[in-house]
């Protein structure tokens, strides 16, 4: 081991032993280039450090290894095991002094396992990393997006769904606080990507909910992504907008309400999503055949955007919506008539749709197998059972909790010095913009 690396080890040991973690965290970024240049002997450095006692020192060695991964081509299993050991054994107290480096390490690790087609091996590791670094279960961190990406690549959603189901009440601002430091130490330029990882979390989250057919929640995630305040459009927001339009049709049969203050949508997104707006317009005609033609017409564009599967779900939703319309008009109808009226290929296909809709609670009906007649029924729920009462009570409690959280967040904003300064500044601007009246006569006139 060279003298420079020996100095690194001694520095880590000395400052860690004295509990000078802040000082160590401020000095270690300067050693990152040194560690990266000596990537071939970094395992020797790790042998002299303890993951629990010297977590900051091990973190930067791991970060250097991941920075060098593209050129060094390390053994994937060995590097994955090292990352797994680190997130399981590190000292969480020390990590608080180098959150940006920890985030960057997780981002690079995610890129590495995705490139090696080993995404499934990274899911539990990044999940553990999130649990370590977040301060609340409802806090969003930049590495939430990494967990979503790994889950999408691996097509495994069991781990990520509990994170997505938690409504966000706080966003990690540690990376933002590091930006001043980043101007001096450019090694952690990734910390400037707060907005990108915020958008990616809601974009990937919407895709995951779409994959598990939780379309209501998917619509909410895409809506957050496209309505995030922005002066210019990002590619992430554009792709989310395309999916937002299609999921809107599945959930509501039309474009879901979009706040008027999202000017970036009308100015930039709509002109770049013409195919999707054509799809919306045709859907409004309730003609399954016309919808099939428009999907076929734009199949190349939908496939290029990885939205062809979603387009097929839109077509399926129109068949279902047209069947639901029949329940409001007819009491009984033959399967062949159902197929004819909703433009399905056969009575067998109509029966399959109706049975699936009965099973999912989308309609209430029964099929007489002898004569092939469908009997449409009213909703059997009378809303007077103990279970329904308990459900209403739980919903009320949930809403009241949300109201309390919103009031708390509003109070924090109102008391924020930056907000107060900006609000007072706006009032001063309003006062100065009102030109004083020029008095040529009686000032009371």
From Swiss-Prot:
Top-level taxon of the source organism: Eukaryota
Pfam families: COP9_hel_rpt (PF22788), PCI (PF01399)
GO cellular component: COP9 signalosome; cytoplasm
Composition-biased stretches (Polar residues): 433-445
Keywords in alphabetical order: Cytoplasm, Developmental protein, Differentiation, Nucleus, Oogenesis, Signalosome
Residue segments, region Disordered: 426-445
Limits of the PCI domain: 217-381
SMART domains: PINT
GO biological process: female germ-line stem cell population maintenance; germ cell development; germarium-derived cystoblast division; male germ-line cyst encapsulation; protein deneddylation; protein stabilization; ubiquitin-dependent protein catabolic process
Location(s) in or outside the cell: Cytoplasm; Nucleus
Similarity field: Belongs to the CSN3 family.
Quaternary data: Component of the CSN complex, probably composed of CSN1b, alien/CSN2, CSN3, CSN4, CSN5, CSN6, CSN7 and CSN8.
Described function: Component of the COP9 signalosome complex (CSN), a complex involved in various cellular and developmental processes. The CSN complex is an essential regulator of the ubiquitin (Ubl) conjugation pathway by mediating the deneddylation of the cullin subunits of the SCF-type E3 ligase complexes, leading to decrease the Ubl ligase activity of SCF. The CSN complex plays an essential role in oogenesis and embryogenesis and is required for proper photoreceptor R cell differentiation and promote lamina glial cell migration or axon targeting.
Protein name: COP9 signalosome complex subunit 3
Protein source organism: Drosophila melanogaster (Fruit fly)
Lineage, uppermost ranks: Eukaryota, Metazoa, Ecdysozoa, Arthropoda, Hexapoda
